[in-house]
């Protein structure tokens, strides 16, 4: 509720009368108007309604006073908050102003310091320039206007370019200051009007543009020269590597800090065979045959050991007599394999001892084996024919 909403006692009485009129019961036919009990009940109802209305009005007044108190407190808090916010904003503005003043003061002090340092440097450079001019004036004016650079034995035989490269940072800075003192002229703008100042500013602007253009051109030229220098160095390194490889040296032998050693003998006359004369003589007298024989024997023994030490395949055992088994042959394929291995070993030993005899024996054995194989084939064919005849007879029966 707002503060403008106020009720007077007359308005409250009107509200009470209206509620009473509304709460009046409808008039019924005068059936029991003369009944005292009925009248008493009606009066009791009216008194109860009046009491309820009074209680409602008192409660409403209490609630309204409570709301007015809360609203008043809220307005007081709002007013206090506005005051504190205004004070805080004022303090913040004051703080910002002080910070800005301090920053401006520090910038002015820094600028003043830089100007003072620059002035001192210029004064020192001017003093040095005056001293140099005075020294030049003191020289003999009748002498030549050029100087001949002579090699000084006390400077380790360095040329002028080498001395220029070996200058320290302080020396270069000093020379830069002196050259700038000659090149930078003071501005004489006292008593100039606006038009002359504009002309002077335009002239200085054109000079700045010209100097920046020259600076950019020189930087680009330096970049190209650095690239060309790197390319030439790499090309020289590759040529030195090829040269070292042709001479039979290490590829990096000629690209190091120090030059390679001088070759005093031809690379084609180097001694590779360090054996003595007696050793070479023995080789030509038959020692080479012995060496080759020993090496062949060694190779043969290694192969023999490899063959005997191989892993043998184990076949499943055969129960019963093998088909095609002859008298004197082993019962199982494993025994036959072992027998064959023993025969091969014996044959190899015989071949090492007597090659010619072994060849003849092998041929005879091959012939015998072929004959045996032929006989076995014939027997198998006969057995097959007999089986076929038996099958035919059975079919006929």
Swiss-Prot record:
Isoform 3 is expressed in the hypoderm. Isoform 8 is expressed in the dorsal vessel. Isoform 6 is expressed in adult TDT muscle and isoform 9 in adult IFM, flight and jump muscles. Disruption phenotype: Flies exhibit 3 distinct syndromes of myofibrillar abnormalities; elimination of thin filaments except where they are bound by electron-dense material presumed to be Z-disk proteins, degeneration of muscles and reduction in the diameter of the myofibril lattice. The keyword Transmembrane does not apply. Residues 1-148, 234-261, 294-397 are annotated as: Disordered. This is Troponin T, skeletal muscle. PANTHER family: TROPONIN T, TROPONIN T, SKELETAL MUSCLE. Residues 1-16, 331-397 have a biased composition (Acidic residues). It comes from the Eukaryota. Belongs to the troponin T family. The keyword Ribosomal protein does not apply. Residues 37-77, 84-129, 136-148, 294-307, 319-329 have a biased composition (Basic and acidic residues). Keywords: Muscle protein. Troponin T is the tropomyosin-binding subunit of troponin, the thin filament regulatory complex which confers calcium-sensitivity to striated muscle actomyosin ATPase activity. It comes from Drosophila melanogaster (Fruit fly). GO terms for biological process: intracellular calcium ion homeostasis; mesoderm development; mitochondrion organization; muscle cell cellular homeostasis; muscle contraction; muscle organ morphogenesis; muscle thin filament assembly; myofibril assembly. InterPro entries: TNNT, Troponin, Troponin_sf. One of its GO terms (cellular component) is striated muscle thin filament. Some glutamate residues are polyglycylated by TTLL3B. This modification occurs exclusively on glutamate residues and results in polyglycine chains on the gamma-carboxyl group. GO terms for molecular function: calcium ion binding; tropomyosin binding.
């Amino acid at each position: 509720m707002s503060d403008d909403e106020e009720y007077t006692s007359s308005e409250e009485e009107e509200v009470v009368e209206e509620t009473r009129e509304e709460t009046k019961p409808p008039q019924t036919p005068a059936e029991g108007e003369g009944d005292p009990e009925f009248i008493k009940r009606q009066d009791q109802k009216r008194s109860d309604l009046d009491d309820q209305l009074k209680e409602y009005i008192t409660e409403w007044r209490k609630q309204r006073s409570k709301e007015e108190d809360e609203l008043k407190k809220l307005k007081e808090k709002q007013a206090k908050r506005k005051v504190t916010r205004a004070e805080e904003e004022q303090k913040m503005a004051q703080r910002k102003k002080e910070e800005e003043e301090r920053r401006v003061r520090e910038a002015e002090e820094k600028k003043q310091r830089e100007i003072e340092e620059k002035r001192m440097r210029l004064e020192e450079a001017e003093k040095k320039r005056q001293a140099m001019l005075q020294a030049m004036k003191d020289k003999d004016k009748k002498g030549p206007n050029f100087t001949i650079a002579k090699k000084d034995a006390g400077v380790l035989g360095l040329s002028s370019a080498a001395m220029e490269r070996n200058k320290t940072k302080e020396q270069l800075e000093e020379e830069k200051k002196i050259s700038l003192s000659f090149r930078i002229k003071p501005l004489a703008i006292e008593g100039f009007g606006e038009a002359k100042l504009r002309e002077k500013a335009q002239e200085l602007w054109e000079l700045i543009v010209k100097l920046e253009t020259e600076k950019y051109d020189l930087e680009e030229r330096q970049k190209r020269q650095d690239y060309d220098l790197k390319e030439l160095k790499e090309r020289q390194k590759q040529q030195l590597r090829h040269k070292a490889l042709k001479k039979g040296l290490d590829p990096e032998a000629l690209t190091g800090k120090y030059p390679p050693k001088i070759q005093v003998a031809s690379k084609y006359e180097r001694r590779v065979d360090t054996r003595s004369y007696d050793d070479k003589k023995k080789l030509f007298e038959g020692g080479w045959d012995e060496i080759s024989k020993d090496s062949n024997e060694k190779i043969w023994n290694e192969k023999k050991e490899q063959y005997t030490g191989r892993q043998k395949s184990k076949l499943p055992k055969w129960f019963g007599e093998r088909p095609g088994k002859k008298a004197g042959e082993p019962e199982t394929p494993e025994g036959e394999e072992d027998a064959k291995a023993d025969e091969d070993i014996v044959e190899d030993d015989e071949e090492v001892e007597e090659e010619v005899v072994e060849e003849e024996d092998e041929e005879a054995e091959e012939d015998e084996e072929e004959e045996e194989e032929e006989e076995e084939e014939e027997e198998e064919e006969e057995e097959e024919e007999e089986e076929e005849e038996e099958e035919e007879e059975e079919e006929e029966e």
